[in-house]
UniProtKB/Swiss-Prot annotation:
Free-text remark on how the cofactor is bound: Binds 1 potassium ion per subunit.
Protein's gene: mnmE
Species name: Treponema pallidum (strain Nichols)
Taxonomic placement: Bacteria, Pseudomonadati, Spirochaetota, Spirochaetia, Spirochaetales
PANTHER family (alphabetical): TRNA MODIFICATION GTPASE GTPBP3, TRNA MODIFICATION GTPASE GTPBP3, MITOCHONDRIAL
NCBIfam families: mnmE_trmE_thdF, small_GTP
Binding-site residues for (6S)-5-formyl-5,6,7,8-tetrahydrofolate, renumbered to this chain: R28, E89, K128, K495
Subcellular location(s) of the protein: Cytoplasm
Family, similarity comment: Belongs to the TRAFAC class TrmE-Era-EngA-EngB-Septin-like GTPase superfamily. TrmE GTPase family.
Record's function text: Exhibits a very high intrinsic GTPase hydrolysis rate. Involved in the addition of a carboxymethylaminomethyl (cmnm) group at the wobble position (U34) of certain tRNAs, forming tRNA-cmnm(5)s(2)U34.
GO cellular component: cytosol
Protein name: tRNA modification GTPase MnmE
InterPro entries: G_TrmE (IPR031168), GTP-bd (IPR006073), GTP-bd_TrmE_N (IPR018948), GTPase_MnmE (IPR004520), MnmE_dom2 (IPR027368), MnmE_helical (IPR025867), P-loop_NTPase (IPR027417), Small_GTP-bd (IPR005225)
Amino acid sequence: MRAHEYALDDDIVAIATALSPAALGIVRTSGSSSIERVASFFSRAQALTRARAHTFLHGWILDGKTRVDEVVLLVYRAPHSFTGEHAVEIICHGGVRTVQAVYRLCLAQGFRAAQRGEFSFRSFFHGKRDLTRIEAIQSLVDARTCAAQQQAVLHLSGALQQEIAALTRALLAFSATLQGEIEYPEDEETRVHDIDMRELEPLVERLRRLRACWQERALQRTGVRIVLGGCPNAGKSSLFNALLGQDRAIVSSVPGTTRDWLEADLDLSGIPVRLCDTAGLRVTDNPIEAQGVVRSEQLLQGADCVFYIINGRAGVQAADCAFLSDCAVPLVVVVTHNDLMSMSERIQVCQAVQPFISAPVLSCARSQDARGAGEQCLAGGKNGEVRDRAPRAFVCVSAKTHAGLDALRAQTLHLLHGGQVPYEELSLGSERQYVLVDAAVQALEHAQEAYARGFGLDAVVHDLEEALYHCGALTGEVHSEDILDALFEKLCVGK
């Protein structure tokens, strides 16, 4: 069933929590008769039908005279609910059988099974949420980092809706001024020279900034895969654990301990990272380890960024130089065991790695509170020795003391994105929103150009009306059935 075909007169029900063993499960209902229908199988029927909005009731779900589960009901009265309708949420124990039994009782009492996104559609239909806040619900569910979660909450609270509403009011006021000049011209000229088109520029700039923020946050949406590579016993697994803040990989002084690759999620300043620890790169007669090496090579070739690990105590090996010469993806050379290295060892490693680094800069701080010029190393390519390649960086770290990890994160962010992203700034929440804002910007820029080239005010007003249409489509004030269908089918059942 498509969103615009939902039967709004039906009472609907859905299981709102994951259907798996858990402490609690929620069965969600909505509709004009939802309270009475739930009362028909609730032990305190009269108390439920008389309950005020936002009231909790404790009791039993009954199948005839048989008790099904001890529950708590949360009662909503229209219009003070998510959907704008009467609604009851049944909070039961989280066993799969129990939740299904309660759900089946709802269906038996005349509730219809809700479709994908139908609760949210009713919220939109009854004016409880605009489309930006509806989309924020799914963004909140999909958020993989704290920054994404905070941006979704910002949208859910109505910040984007309010921004677009303010822009719309300003555009309407400006358009009304132009309309007045057209309807009541002071002379025979269609164009009136005292119209200050500069008033339009701040509005265009605000929309441009929303568009730019969406483009700047591409990595926040797509995420990146960072693969740790290097020779056996270089310290890959130790660094993997240090970055995660937990012991996920087995660490041993025995070379070849890691035979298969491990993966874990990491939040890199708002960018979701899939971090991979791999088997050490070397020629081996062990068939199992050899398979691990092949997988490591494949993962390194397909990475968005490589952390190539070198044991600072062992120095740079021929195998390290071979890999650094051939690697074609963004790469950070990470020298480990920095807490155990002498100054001469640091200098030797820096000199050996220098020809392979095209982007200088990195910290080789010996400890978190180390000071002094001797504790820093800069690596930069020599003239004629650095070929064109993907961006690279060089950091010395200690997985034991965590010295240098902040520098590693900062350099990685710089390689992938070019610097820190101000995630607290309001942005757009979906590709649909980006397309509409981009269209609005183009319409307003066309209006500015039309006025500058001496076209009549009618042409300018036409462009303003087009921009207003796109702003209205963004919040849902104007919409088509196809847009609603595409948006609400992305939401899960129970949303």
